[in-house]
């Protein structure tokens, strides 16, 4: 869930509360959390998968974002690389059911996602790792001299096309301004 910030503090607080309590945004977030819990459980120690935060509202310069955090301890004998690999593609980028959603993405999108919806991070020598899904990032192709960025939203049974499109524009706004585009 994403919502535009307001310059008026009272209106901004109201937007935060509305985002945190929006049933559609909550159901999308729960779907993603369930996918992450399922993916992590394949390599997690028994009972170690925890939802540390559900429906946290984080405020950024121009938007509020609904964020949840899931963690797990790696099961003995399982590698962190295998655990990470088996989380891909990320449910937050595909939706559910994951396999069918990927088939629809392949059929509907006219180009590969490339780095967008992939991950960047690190593995530490002691086995810890931290990765972040690549969203709202600007990419530059030196060969084609092309700057690009991508934004997306969730298509669910309760989704309204105009609202989802507006959410994409909001998510892309900072990138658009960073590259100097007016449109």
What are the residue ranges of the model-derived segments?
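Extended alpha-helical targeting/anchoring segments
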Residues: 1-183
């Amino acid at each position: 869930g994403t919502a535009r910030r307001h310059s008026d503090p009272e209106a901004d607080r109201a937007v935060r509360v509305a985002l945190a309590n929006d049933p559609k945004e909550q159901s999308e977030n729960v779907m993603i959390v369930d996918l992450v819990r399922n993916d992590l459980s394949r390599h997690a120690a028994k009972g170690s998968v925890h939802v540390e935060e559900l429906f946290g509202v984080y405020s950024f310069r121009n938007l509020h974002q609904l964020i949840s955090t899931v963690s797990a301890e790696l099961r003995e004998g399982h590698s962190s690389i295998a655990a990470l690999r088996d989380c891909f593609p990320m449910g937050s980028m595909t939706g559910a059911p994951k396999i069918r959603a990927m088939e629809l993405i392949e059929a509907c999108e006219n180009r590969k996602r490339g780095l967008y919806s992939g991950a960047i991070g690190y593995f530490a020598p002691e086995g810890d790792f931290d990765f972040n899904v690549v969203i709202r990032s600007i990419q530059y192709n030196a060969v084609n001299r092309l700057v690009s960025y991508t934004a997306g939203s969730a298509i669910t049974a309760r989704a309204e096309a105009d609202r989802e499109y507006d959410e994409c524009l909001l998510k892309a706004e900072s990138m658009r301004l960073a590259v100097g585009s007016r449109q």
